[in-house]
Amino acid sequence: MRKIYTIETSNFEQDQLHFSLNDNEVNLQLKPAGQLIADSDDFAFIYLLDAGEDYHYLRFPPSSWENLVHILQKKKDPILRINDEAIELINFYDELEMLVYNIEGNYNYGAEFVQTVEQHFKAILAE
């Protein structure tokens, strides 16, 4: 069964962003799938986590996008902390950079979503 985890807490450790996921499930076996998609209906970026038989979603709402700007500025993949385990979210930086530039001015994503992305990532898009 697919689960959606919303990222709400983060911190920097040694110049690298760490997202926290506190889940009470025992033996939560998730592997980074290396793919980030845009959910223009719910205004979020979704990182896919391989759970074996299906994918789970790591959801980044606009309240977390300031941290995503830092990822693009630092050019480093973030770390996901699940309880005591640290997992590097591979390809996150590359996928996010590609998506942000693809969304810019592309109203196939919906005008409101495009405007919200352009506003949050204006420092990156201005480079």
Curated annotation (Swiss-Prot):
It holds the Pfam family UPF0738. This is UPF0738 protein Bsph_1225. InterPro entries: UPF0738. It comes from the Bacteria. It comes from Lysinibacillus sphaericus (strain C3-41). Belongs to the UPF0738 family.
